[in-house]
Amino acid sequence: MSHYKSNVRDQVFNLFEVFGVDKVLGADKFSDLDADTAREMLTEIARLAEGPIAESFVEGDRNPPVFDPETHTVTLPEGFKKSMRALFDGGWDKVGLAEHLGGIPMPRALQWALIEHILGANPAAYMYAMGPGMSEIFYNNGTDEQKKWATIAAERGWGATMVLTEPDAGSDVGAGRTKAVQQPDGTWHIEGVKRFITSADSDDLFENIMHLVLARPEGAGPGTKGLSLFFVPKFHFDHETGEIGERNGVFVTNVEHKMGLKVSATCELSLGQHGIPAVGWLVGEVHNGIAQMFDVIEQARMMVGTKAIATLSTGYLNALEYAKERVQGADMTQMTDKTAPRVTITHHPDVRRSLMTQKAYAEGLRAIYLYTATFQDAEVAQAVHGVDGDLAARVNDLLLPIVKGFGSETAYAKLTESLQTLGGSGFLQDYPIEQYIRDSKIDSLYEGTTAIQAQDFFFRKIIRDKGQALAYVAGEIEQFIKNENGNGRLKTERELLATALADVQGMAASLTGYLMAAQEDAASIYKVGLGSVRFLMAVGDLLSGWLLARQAAVAIEKLDAGATGADKSFYEGKIAAASFFAKNMLPLLTSTRQIIENLDNDVMELDEAAF
């Protein structure tokens, strides 16, 4: 039996019943795709994920990649490569890719819904399969000549990496020292060592790998502004035919031993260090590396958040299945009666609390990433939200740190509830949840730690944006609060949501006040740092509560229209999750607001020796 448990029903509900993404299908850019086809695609990829892709999940963990320092190569477990080939054979690595690169255009919301299944079943499989998506980013940023190379890479299914991190330049990317030296023929020789590079070698999955490398040209200034982006292929190739040539001077020199996500080869990558120059080409022939790389980074952050959410969802569904079957103890109302019948643990109050917590967060987080994705296509944003492309881009930028930061922190935390549901059995490798937890911890670390996400959220996505995107989302929440959808049956939930919105707005005002005060007292900026992660998490809870309540309003309409059977149970679950979240999670934001409003610098003024 597969460890992975999909939830296509919830995806379809979000896409078509709540957000109305079907409005854009069958016309213009998406003329070849209708709602029925979209449903079939979701069902088909869920079947593939539960079968061939999930099959090697455990094998890849127990038998991680083997590095050969003599050949600088990585050997992957055979079962995992079989899973990858099943993914490639179905063309699933090209979902959402531009038509001129061999893909099928589709709304980003549908694309991410499809990807959720791969990430939930075997997350490393999607990471190895990111080549076509990276090819499109290279195509969009490249010169006319480089667009040809990107097309070759997509057509031939090459692998790809994003190469930023160095031993002394992690979150501080601008401290990178990898050097680029221009050659007389216009190419560049890249010299340096990079660290924590995902999929820098991948056995025989790909005939070539294109590395997108941040490096500092000789004479360039310090910090991120001095960095440029270079295309550095593993093998040289014929620029017209794509035929593979000689080895380029970029070699894997180590593979990390990790807590989880083991089958994903996390590599040290040395450039120009082994007697062969690492030849690269300046992407777009412009020195604009960090801005170009942010196209890749934003894609990666969306992926990480979706991965975390997918893992929590399957963790919850595994816990639910176990709880429905595990018989232990009597019902609490009969706990003093030693002759009372034994019941399944779903009868116990704390198990129900835990399961509903998992359900509410798993489904709330799914709603957040899909809501975010509806702003990633101008056509969808216009049809679904009535906003123009500029505002859509701003809202997407605002929400990405929520998807990544809030999603990764929350999924990891609530997966412990999934494990707890299984009791001691959850601690065993007989069940998948302990691996889910190990595999998901990385999500709050790579592609920008949660603190980085929180500061990006506050400084760039709110302050620099002058609050435009935040005001739009707050306005949407206010409109829902005032709406009477549900015939008054969500009155309490709306009142709790209104309080939560006011609490979040109060937090934003306090943090802005600390920022303004820093103009006179520089140390005041510390308070922003002390409060920003809590603020990010609070906004995530607010969005979860709102989107769950929106779902409940739709569910009430469906029940009033006579839904029966499995649909009736599904909609009743939606109302229950929204009500539970509003009553149990949203009130906690009031205390968070009080904490942020009363922040001081005591912890910053404490001597380091006292820690």
Curated annotation (Swiss-Prot):
Pathway as given in its UniProt record: Lipid metabolism; fatty acid metabolism
List of residues binding a 2,3-saturated acyl-CoA: 171, 224-225, 301, 338, 447, 456, 460-461
Reaction(s) catalysed (UniProt annotation): a long-chain 2,3-saturated fatty acyl-CoA + oxidized [electron-transfer flavoprotein] + H(+) = a long-chain (2E)-enoyl-CoA + reduced [electron-transfer flavoprotein]; a medium-chain 2,3-saturated fatty acyl-CoA + oxidized [electron-transfer flavoprotein] + H(+) = a medium-chain (2E)-enoyl-CoA + reduced [electron-transfer flavoprotein]; a short-chain 2,3-saturated fatty acyl-CoA + oxidized [electron-transfer flavoprotein] + H(+) = a short-chain (2E)-enoyl-CoA + reduced [electron-transfer flavoprotein]; octadecanoyl-CoA + oxidized [electron-transfer flavoprotein] + H(+) = (2E)-octadecenoyl-CoA + reduced [electron-transfer flavoprotein]
GO biological process terms, semicolon-separated: fatty acid metabolic process
Gene Ontology annotations for the cellular component aspect, listed alphabetically: plasma membrane
Catalytic residues (UniProt): 447 (proton acceptor)
UniProt key word Protease: no
Needed cofactors: FAD
GO molecular function: long-chain fatty acyl-CoA dehydrogenase activity; medium-chain fatty acyl-CoA dehydrogenase activity; short-chain fatty acyl-CoA dehydrogenase activity
Entry EC number(s): 1.3.8.8, 1.3.8.7, 1.3.8.1
Keywords associated with the record: FAD, Fatty acid metabolism, Flavoprotein, Lipid metabolism, Oxidoreductase
Transmembrane domains' residue ranges: none
Enzyme kind, highest EC tier: oxidoreductase
InterPro entries: Acyl-CoA_dh-like_C_dom, Acyl-CoA_DH_N_bac, Acyl-CoA_Oxase/DH_mid-dom, AcylCo_DH-like_C, AcylCo_DH/oxidase_C, AcylCoA_DH/oxidase_NM_dom_sf, Diverse_Acyl-CoA_DH
Disruption phenotype: Disruption of the gene does not affect the growth rate, but mutant shows decreased resistance to ethambutol and streptomycin.
Binding-site list for FAD: 162-165, 171, 198, 326, 420-424, 449
Entries under PANTHER family matching the protein: ACYL-COA DEHYDROGENASE, BROAD-SPECIFICITY LINEAR ACYL-COA DEHYDROGENASE FADE5
Stated family: Belongs to the acyl-CoA dehydrogenase family.
Entry function: Acyl-CoA dehydrogenase that exhibits broad specificity for linear acyl-CoA substrates, with a preference for long-chain substrates.
Quaternary context: Homodimer.
Protein known as: Broad-specificity linear acyl-CoA dehydrogenase FadE5
Species whose genome carries this gene: Mycolicibacterium smegmatis (strain ATCC 700084 / mc(2)155) (Mycobacterium smegmatis)
